Every structure is written in C-alpha cells, then in structure tokens.
Amino acid sequence: IDKMKKSSFLLATCLVFTAVSNAQTFLTKNGKISFFSKTAVENIDAVNNQVVSVLNTSNGDIAFSVIIKGFLFKKALMQEHFNESYLESDKFPKATFKGKIAEIAKINFTRDGLYPVKVNGDLTLHGVTKKIAGTANLIVKAGKIAASSVFSILLADYNISIPKMVENS
C-alpha cells in the first residue's frame, strides 16, 4: 500500500444466500468482497471471505457488514499499512452497506436464472456514510441466490487519505 497512487478502489461483492426462518429472508455469513487499485508501481488487491449479508426478497432490502481486518493481502506489509495507516481498522472496525434492490417484484425467485438489477443505498466506510448506486446480478439456482456487483469508490469521499509522498512516488 505504500506504493498506492490511485485514490479509488474497485470493489467487487459476491454473496450466496440461503433461506432463514421464512422464505423471504436470505442470509450468508461467508460472502466475499474484494478490492483492486491499480498503481504505476504495484497493483493492490485484497479479499475478505467473512462478509455477513441479508436479503429480503419481498421488499428488496439488502445489507452487508464486513470486518476490515478480514481483508487478506498477498503481502503482509500491505495488510499492515491498510489496517493501521489507511482504514484505521482499530478505530473503524467494519464497513456496512444498507440498501434496496429496485423492482424486486419482477424477479422470480422460484425460477433459476440470471437477473440484472439496480441497487442503491448507503455505504459506511471509515466512519463516513455516502449514497452509492450501481448494478448487480442476482443468480437464482436450485433455491439459492447469489449476488455479485462491481463498483468504484473514491477514497477521499470516505476521508481516507494517502500521504503525499506515497501518492507522488
């Protein structure tokens, strides 16, 4: 991360839901979020497989929570800098998203298929909450629902600063 020059992350989510108490609420405790940032010196990427997420198929409510320290990097030093210097994970231990899938009633959750959807809501990261909107794919297969989405955020929007000497190197 010391060599990070870009001030944005590309976030990808992949969640596989299974039904809980009633057929309209689906839950996963092992969703996946990854991020990628391209720099001139070195690309930075990490994966977190400990994402908790809930989807209500009757009203389109969707939410997830991720423990920041759960992101794993290829290099230990990157992980250390990410947690201590950039995301300050002791002070801001998790990120959350609370939103809604538009036109959820048009999706037939009893029929296998790929359903492109629009999602919007509030992403809270580093103690800052911002509205985000994007597209996602819902995949229904054998009674299970998988969701995936890719979106970009600007680090500055979430008060995540990169030291000038790192940004300019």
Regions found by a protein language model. Give the residues of each.
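Bacterial Sec-dependent N-terminal signal peptides
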Residues: 1-26
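Low-complexity, acidic/polar, glycine-enriched regions of mature
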Residues: 23-169
